[in-house]
Regions:
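Sec-dependent bacterial lipoprotein signal peptides
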Residues: 1-24
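Aromatic-residue-lined binding/catalytic grooves and analogous aromatic/hydrophobic interfacial grooves
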Residues: 25-26, 218-259, 509-512, 516
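Membrane-proximal, proline-rich intrinsically disordered regions
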Residues: 25-72, 473-517
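Conserved, well-structured interaction surfaces
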Residues: 83-153, 179, 183-187, 196-208, ...
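Short coil/turn linking the two alpha-helices of tandem helical-hairpin repeats
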Residues: 149-156, 207, 230-236, 381-383
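Short coil/linker segments at helix-helix boundaries
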Residues: 151-191, 234-244
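Hydrophobic-face positions in mid-chain alpha helices that act as interaction patches
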Residues: 240-369, 402-438, 458-459, 463-464, ...
């Protein structure tokens, strides 16, 4: 296992200065190191920007924390102790990959590399020839801080000016033991917005030989769409920015830009066949792909490891990737998860098992499918119901065999009739919503239920459900599937929704997240 030892925050990334990158014998990983075609740019800055992309993923942590996981009982094992801790919403003691400690170090390490690049560009006088690199560094810095806030802070809401943030690193650190204040979540989001908006206008797509491993314009627009969706305002003015940036990615007719789910479903779920196709850089639906050191690829493989605290067949058939919906029964869904006789887990094959000394995982960070659902949600919040229904129709035609057009009335009627979820007795995708912002009963709420349902189906295994749970104040439960008992519950105001910062950071003097309601 790969263990990282971090101080209160990483200091200079000395290895990044020499362009150190992850290397693997796997074909996909061999393509990850930057092969930028230099166009009058500085080689060292270009190499340094490779390290501005984090080599960590929160997907395992987020999936374990969310309602996409159950305790299937002691008959089944778990891969590492942290899976048990994270599933039970405990403050994690372990420090290997996929833990909060690893994520903290990975994201701040990438931020340090971005800041070093920005400093080097500044020392050259910020020449126009380096604008693309400056833009890429700014967007990387914004993204990493955004992810840290998504992990270690509450969801952004009207109390953000009173909620703990995370340190926003804007300079190259030159002291051995600096002290940092966390500030507020409001301050973090404002700085993310500043860096993102400045950076996105500077990015150029012309300098990359493998663009899908970089923030191209479209990838940056997709990030902006998701960021503004999370940057929720009581009047939903943020949704105008979501629609704007998502439309820059998708245009007015997104159908041809979405993933070919039918073709993907025809590939074998064994080995890496389907998984490799899902993460292929040649796929137009993939806007940004990452290479990370993570066990999540192993847990999501056909090696059948660690199934105890995991997505199981009960969840699949009642709430997620084999559930019924507007499209009809699960027979209408193209993509089917991997499972086998006597095996409780139900696994969507979205990343293969790649071993290059460590276990590697290749997440798709941004895709056209997810960006489409960001726009559909923004339309629904703005009460632009026909436009939202049109985007939902585009999703349905791509993801299912049902090619019919959906109307707002049809969506409203379907989810209005659906019973609300209760553990064990009424297992449906429809859960009580208690967000900080106001949702109207009826049409608006039911279209949002639809979007939350199909996003959960589409992005299963990719960590997107946990932010939705936080944003919408969804009550979730820990269920023992053997005893048929609820062992814990997490209401909307539960302080554990802000995952605890690493212990060594707390010991070094940083304010921890509170733990008593």
């Amino acid at each position: 296992m790969k263990t990282k030892i971090n101080h209160i925050l990483p200091v200079l990334l000395l290895t990044a200065a020499s362009g150190l990158t992850t290397v693997s014998c796997n074909d996909f990983l061999d393509k990850t190191p930057d092969n930028r075609t230099e166009l009058n740019t500085d080689q060292k800055i270009a190499k340094l920007l490779v390290s501005a992309y984090p080599d960590v993923s929160p997907n395992e942590l987020f999936e374990l924390y969310s309602d996409n996981s159950d305790d299937s009982g002691p008959t089944y094992g778990y891969y590492q102790l942290s899976e048990k801790e994270c599933y039970n919403w405990e403050d994690t003691k372990e420090e290997y990959q996929d833990t909060p400690n690893s994520l903290w170090g990975g994201y701040y390490g990438a931020i340090s590399a971005a800041n070093m690049a920005l400093k080097a560009i500044e020392e050259k006088g910020n020449p126009a020839s380096l604008n693309p690199q400056r833009g890429e560094a700014l967007v990387c810095r914004a993204y990493c801080h955004f992810m840290l806030a998504t992990i270690f802070c509450n969801a952004y809401d009207t109390h953000a000016s009173e909620s703990l943030g995370i340190p926003y690193m804007e300079d190259v650190e030159t002291t051995v033991s600096p002290r940092y204040e966390r500030g507020t979540l409001e301050e973090v989001y404002r700085k993310v917005e500043r860096d993102l908006l400045e950076g996105v206008e500077l990015i150029s797509d012309d300098g990359y030989s493998v663009p899908k491993y970089h923030f191209t314009r479209k990838a940056a627009y997709a990030f902006a769409a998701r960021f503004y969706l999370y940057y929720m305002k009581p009047d939903f003015s943020n949704c105008d920015r979501v629609i704007d940036f998502a439309t820059r990615v998708l245009g007015s007719n997104p159908d041809d830009l979405l993933r070919d789910w039918e073709a993907l479903s025809n590939l074998s779920v064994n080995g890496n066949v389907q998984a490799d196709a899902y993460i292929a850089s040649s796929n137009e639906a993939n806007l940004l792909i990452s290479s990370t050191v993570s066990n999540w690829g192993a847990l999501g493989s056909d090696y059948l490891v660690g199934p105890r605290y995991f997505h199981n067949q009960t969840l699949a058939t009642s709430e997620t990737c084999l559930s019924a919906g507007l499209w009809g029964s699960s027979d209408y869904l193209y993509l089917k998860p991997f499972s086998t006789t006597g095996f409780v887990a139900s696994i969507p094959r979205k990343s293969g098992l790649y071993d290059g000394g460590y276990l590697y995982y290749m997440p798709v960070l941004f895709s056209t499918d997810e960006t489409l659902l960001c726009r559909a949600e923004a339309y629904a919040l703005k009460k632009m119901y026909p436009q939202s229904a049109a985007d939902i129709t585009s999703w349905q035609r791509a993801y299912t065999r049902n090619k019919s057009a959906l109307t707002p009335d049809q969506i409203n009627a379907y989810y209005d009739k659906m019973n609300f979820y209760t553990p064990f007795t009424q297992q449906t995708p429809k859960k009580q919503l208690a967000p900080d912002f106001t949702i109207e009963e009826g049409m608006q709420e039911n279209i949002l239920h639809c979007i939350l349902h199909i996003r959960r189906v589409t992005t299963l295994h990719e960590g997107m459900r946990w932010p939705d749970i936080k944003r919408y104040g969804i009550m979730i439960y820990r269920r023992n599937m053997v005893t048929q008992r609820v062992t814990d519950e997490m209401p909307p105001n539960d302080l554990r929704r802000a995952i605890q910062i690493p212990r060594n950071v707390i010991v070094a003097g940083m304010q921890p997240n509170p733990r008593r309601n």
